[in-house]
């Protein structure tokens, strides 16, 4: 997010340190948008993106029921703001397309992260035929040091930076595909159907 682009990232679970932070994500056991606290690790937490979101027109509101992770919480509150420049700068797409891309990005990118982080199996109660170990969450997890590798604070912080770059790059690429390929193709198909 642009407003935190130059911020220092503090990786801690110390509540006194967290209290000094402008925004706290995935730790602290608090979800409160007013104080910018975005953790989903409470027994009582059950928020989903399908809940009413004030910035999304009713017709475009997602009907998703996957419990949000910290990723989904940040997307819920800042996704529109983050997507707008990516859509309008250089692509020539109208800002009115934002709710459509917001919903599509959740369905095609963020919901998977939410489900995996919350332990939701893709097959529900059915037995899995195979495991997927190459998804974004798995690749981010593979950036953690192995048990027999050096894993001090400096190393972990550097690897966290790599994980942020990986996730951010994939998010940006997914938005790019939607705005430069999916939406233009959809418009062509709709025009052909209308003829």
List the model feature ranges, each with a label:
Residues 142-195:
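Hydrophobic helix-and-loop "lid/oligomerization" segment in the mid-to-C-terminal part
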């Amino acid at each position: 997010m642009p407003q935190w682009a130059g911020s220092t990232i503090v990786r801690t679970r110390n509540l006194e340190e967290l209290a000094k932070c402008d925004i706290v994500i995935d730790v602290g056991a608090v979800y409160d948008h007013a104080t910018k606290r975005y953790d989903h690790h409470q027994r009582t937490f059950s928020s989903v993106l399908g809940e009413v979101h004030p910035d999304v027109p009713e017709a475009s509101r997602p009907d998703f029921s996957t419990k949000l992770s910290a990723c989904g919480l940040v997307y819920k509150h800042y996704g529109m703001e983050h997507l707008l420049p990516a859509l309008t700068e250089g692509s020539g797409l109208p800002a009115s397309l934002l709710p459509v891309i917001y919903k599509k990005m959740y369905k095609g990118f963020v919901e998977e992260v939410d489900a995996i982080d919350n332990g939701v199996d893709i097959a529900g109660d059915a037995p899995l035929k195979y495991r997927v170990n190459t998804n974004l969450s798995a690749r981010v997890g593979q950036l953690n040091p192995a048990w027999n590798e050096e894993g001090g604070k400096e190393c972990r912080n550097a690897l966290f930076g790599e994980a942020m770059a990986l996730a951010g790059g994939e998010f940006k690429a997914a938005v790019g595909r939607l705005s430069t390929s999916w939406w233009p193709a959809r418009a062509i198909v709709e025009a052909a159907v209308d003829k």
